[in-house]
Amino acid sequence: MIRIGPAGNSESFTAMGYKSTPQIPEYLEKMGLNAYEYQCGRGVRINREGVLKLKAGCEARDIQLSLHAPYYISLSSVEEEKRQNSIKYILESAEAADLMGAHRIVVHSGSCAKISREEALSLAGETLKQALAALDEAH
């Protein structure tokens, strides 16, 4: 089945009188949509009660959730600390996604900065392998 829906709350969400994320399932149903990407671009900060309401509403309406991990993830940074922090942010995103019943996490690898694409791809690949191992270990 093809799933279509917004990433975050659009202007029409508030224009239609909705105020908070737990109301998203009702809004999506009215719009004929069946997917929603929860935005954590500026950090994984969730309200547990609100997320559980979102999950219940989406499950009741067959709406599939995904979660967008923080934008500041940098899998290809030349700084080891930034790469390790990126793994931590991915783990935090996975924990939040699990809580809300999201089936996917969207992660951008970051830029090449001052290194070649080949070097950046190599670093990103290695960091992603470490993140996947950490996710396996966490479950």
Labelled PLM ranges:
Residues 1-92:
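N-terminal pre-domain/capping segments
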Residues 59, 76-139:
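Active-site acidic/histidine proton-transfer and metal-coordination neighborhood
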